[in-house]
């Protein structure tokens, strides 16, 4: 996995200034996400694998030896460079981690990362087993990973996180013990965890579910404070029940994907991959306001400053 820094500041040359190679990840999802003040750049694995400091491991040992992960790369704004020596990684289960977003305002200090294939399916169609995609879609839900990067940062600075191949790595055991990592069921095969401008809600769409789910940060924090969990995953990570974290669900259409925000309160736009449409909807009330047909199998979309605390509205690019 690699992260690239390009100089796009006004008057600059738009050339690549830095390429950072991950010392542990063998793959990553093609998306980099920054915390509100660009303290960190979030990079998640996509396909679980043995970390780079481990040799070959057969698929038969997938559950025990393969791992996912989420790295918070420290960014020095004065120098315009990523600082690997001040970055850190969360070890995560061998689920396929997907897109991320950082909390803002009320949820500042926390990060949210999707996942798919929590079935930990490894294929085998040549042996008469279901195709990989089918095996990775057999459950109704996957997991939203909730990480407390602010507290993790303090542990790293205090020298309380062990190094691995030159990178501080917070093991799952340490993350659980320190209250840094939680899981929440989400509609299966999601693609996008989008934090609302006020930081109060997290919007998740599952490509294989017609509903878009809106999670409440306040409810998530209440469940954590009360120790209200429905159980643990196979790696001991506490699971917050979906019903205890959910604010509302909205049935937007087929294949909801990526969400961006309007300048008007509670208004968002979500791409519908299967319907080839964009839905305009109220995420506070869970009501569809409008739909428009658009390019075949639309993917991501963007509104003017639509992922900031002050979206500008005016235009949507699909």
Language model segments and positions:
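Predominantly soluble domains enriched in secretory-pathway, periplasmic, or organellar proteins
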Residues: 1-318
């Amino acid at each position: 996995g690699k992260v690239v820094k390009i100089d796009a500041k006004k008057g600059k040359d738009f050339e690549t200034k830095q390429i950072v190679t991950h010392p542990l990840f063998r793959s990553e999802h093609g998306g980099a996400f920054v915390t509100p003040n660009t303290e960190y750049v979030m990079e998640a694995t996509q396909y679980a694998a043995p970390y780079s400091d481990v040799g070959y491991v057969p698929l038969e040992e997938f559950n025990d030896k393969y791992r996912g992960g989420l790295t918070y790369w420290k960014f020095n704004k004065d120098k315009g460079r990523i600082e690997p020596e001040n970055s850190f990684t969360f070890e995560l289960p061998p689920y396929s981690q997907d897109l991320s977003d950082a909390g803002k305002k009320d949820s500042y200090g926390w990060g949210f990362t999707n996942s798919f294939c929590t079935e930990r399916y490894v294929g085998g169609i040549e042996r008469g087993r279901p195709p990989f995609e089918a095996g990775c879609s057999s459950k109704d839900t996957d997991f939203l990973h909730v990480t407390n990067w602010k507290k993790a940062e303090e542990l790293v600075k205090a020298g309380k996180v062990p190094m691995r191949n030159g990178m501080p790595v917070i093991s799952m055991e340490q993350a659980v013990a320190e209250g840094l990592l939680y899981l929440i069921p989400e509609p299966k095969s999601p693609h996008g965890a989008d934090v609302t401008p006020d930081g109060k809600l997290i919007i998740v769409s599952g490509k294989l579910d017609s509903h878009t789910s809106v999670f409440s940060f306040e409810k998530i924090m209440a469940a954590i404070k009360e120790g209200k969990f429905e159980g643990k995953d196979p790696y001991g990570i506490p699971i917050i029940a979906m019903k205890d974290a959910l604010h509302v669900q909205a049935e937007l259409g087929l294949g909801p994907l990526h969400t961006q925000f309007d300048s008007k309160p509670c208004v968002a736009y979500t791409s519908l991959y299967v319907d080839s449409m964009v839905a305009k909807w109220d995420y506070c009330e869970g009501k569809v306001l409008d739909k428009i047909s658009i390019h075949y199998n639309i993917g991501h979309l963007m509104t003017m400053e639509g992922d900031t605390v002050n979206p500008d509205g005016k235009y949507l690019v699909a």
